[in-house]
C-alpha cells in the first residue's frame, strides 16, 4: 500500500482551509479539471467518431459572437448578458459551488472575475457538432501563459450547447501542447480529423443535465478521491454528483453535509489495461473557523490486493466530530465510518 494510504491524516492535510466564497478563478479550475485530463493522452491511430462537420465560417461566426458577448458580460458584470450566453447546466453548477461554500450567487461570481482571453490572440482551427447538431466544439490555437509557467502554445476549446433556440457557452478548456508535437502540428495545419480523434476537442455527445439547486449547507463538506486505474461515479445525499477518472482530486460537496445521517453511493469501474494500486475515498467536514482542522467522517481505503466494490452507505456526523475539529479538543476523537475495515499496518 502506498504511504499515502497509511494515514488518513495525509488526506486531511490537503483539505486544511477556512471555508470562504469561491473566486471565479477557483470555480473555473474546479470545473475544468476533469475536462482537461484526457486530452493529455495521445490519440489512438485511426480512432474517429461520428460528428457533423458544419460550415466552418458559419460555425466560427456563431461561436465568436456568443463567446465575445459572454466575455464582455464578465468584464461589465452583466448578469443578464451572462445568463443569456451561458448554458443552464453551467449556471447551476457555478451557483451550487458558490452556495455550498456559503457564498452569495451571483454576487461572488462577478465580484472578482478575471478577464477571459481575447479570441484575436488565437488562430481558428475548426469546429465539430455532435448530438444531432445540438452541441458544438470550436478549437483555437495560440500562445498562452497559465499560472507561473512560461508562455506556451495551447489549444483553446470552446464547448457550446443549443438550448432555448440559441447557442450558449458551456465551458472553455486550455490544453498545453508542449508534449504533444504531433497534435500541435496537425492543429496548425487545420486538420479536422485530429479534432475527431482527440476527445478533448470533441463536442458533447449529449446535452449536459442541469443539477438541482442545492440549499446552503449545514456543514461545508469536501470529498477526496484517489483512484488510479479506476473510474468512480458518486452521489452524496442524493444531490451532489461527482465523477472521478484515474485521478486524485478533491471536490466541494454540493449542498454540504448535515448533522446526523448522511448517505453516499458510488460505482467503481476498472479502467481496462491500467494498473490499479491502492485507492481511497474520504469525506470531510471542512472547518469554518480559523485554526480548526478538517475531520474525516467516512472513508473507503483499499490496497492493490483488494477488490474495489461500490455500494450505498449511511454515515452519521455527531457533535463529537465537530468538536474534535478544535485543536483544544481533549476528548476521544471519533472514528470515521469505514466502508471496509482498515487493515493493520505491517
What are these regions (language model features)?
Residues 1-125:
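Hydrophobic, helix-prone linear segments
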Residues 32-34, 50-58, 62, 68-75, ...:
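Beta-strand-rich recognition domains
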Residues 102-157:
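Surface-exposed, charged secondary-structure patches
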Residues 104-108, 116-118, 191-194, 257, ...:
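Short, intrinsically disordered/low-complexity patches at protein termini
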Residues 240-246:
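Short beta-strand segments within Ig-like beta-sandwich modules, predominantly Fibronectin type-III
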Residues 249-261:
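Exposed aromatic-hydrophobic patches
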Amino acid at each position: 500500500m502506498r504511504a499515502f494510504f497509511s494515514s488518513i491524516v495525509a488526506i486531511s492535510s490537503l483539505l486544511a482551509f477556512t471555508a470562504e466564497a469561491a473566486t471565479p478563478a477557483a470555480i473555473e479550475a474546479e470545473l475544468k479539471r476533469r475536462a482537461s485530463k484526457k486530452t493529455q493522452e495521445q490519440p489512438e491511430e485511426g480512432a474517429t467518431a461520428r460528428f457533423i462537420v458544419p460550415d466552418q465560417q458559419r460555425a466560427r461566426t456563431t461561436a465568436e459572437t456568443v463567446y465575445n458577448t459572454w466575455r464582455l458580460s464578465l468584464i461589465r458584470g452583466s448578469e443578464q448578458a451572462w445568463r443569456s450566453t451561458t448554458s443552464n447546466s453551467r449556471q447551476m453548477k457555478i451557483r451550487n459551488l458558490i452556495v455550498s461554500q456559503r457564498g452569495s450567487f451571483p454576487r461572488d461570481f462577478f465580484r472578482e472575475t478575471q478577464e477571459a482571453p481575447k479570441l484575436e490572440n488565437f488562430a481558428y482551427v475548426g469546429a465539430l457538432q455532435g448530438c444531432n447538431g445540438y452541441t458544438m466544439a470550436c478549437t483555437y490555437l495560440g500562445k498562452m501563459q497559465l499560472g507561473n509557467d512560461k508562455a506556451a502554445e495551447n489549444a483553446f476549446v470552446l464547448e457550446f450547447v443549443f438550448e432555448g433556440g440559441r447557442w450558449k457557452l458551456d465551458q472553455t478548456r486550455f490544453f498545453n501542447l508542449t508534449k504533444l508535437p504531433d497534435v500541435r502540428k496537425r492543429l496548425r495545419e487545420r486538420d479536422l480529423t485530429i479534432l475527431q480523434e482527440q476527445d478533448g476537442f470533441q463536442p458533447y455527445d449529449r446535452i449536459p443535465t442541469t443539477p438541482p439547486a442545492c440549499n446552503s449547507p449545514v456543514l461545508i463538506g469536501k470529498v477526496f478521491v484517489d483512484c488510479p486505474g479506476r473510474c468512480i461515479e458518486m452521489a452524496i445525499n442524493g444531490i451532489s454528483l461527482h465523477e472521478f477518472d484515474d485521478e486524485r482530486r478533491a471536490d466541494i460537496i454540493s449542498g454540504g453535509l448535515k448533522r446526523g445521517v448522511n448517505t453516499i453511493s458510488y460505482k467503481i469501474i476498472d479502467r481496462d489495461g491500467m494498473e490499479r494500486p491502492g485507492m481511497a475515498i474520504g469525506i470531510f467536514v471542512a472547518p469554518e473557523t480559523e485554526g480548526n482542522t478538517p475531520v474525516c467522517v467516512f472513508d473507503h481505503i483499499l490496497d492493490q490486493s483488494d477488490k474495489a466494490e461500490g455500494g450505498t452507505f449511511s454515515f452519521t456526523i455527531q457533535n463529537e466530530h465537530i468538536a474534535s475539529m478544535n485543536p483544544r479538543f481533549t476528548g476521544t476523537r471519533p472514528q470515521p465510518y469505514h466502508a471496509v475495515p482498515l487493515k493493520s499496518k505491517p
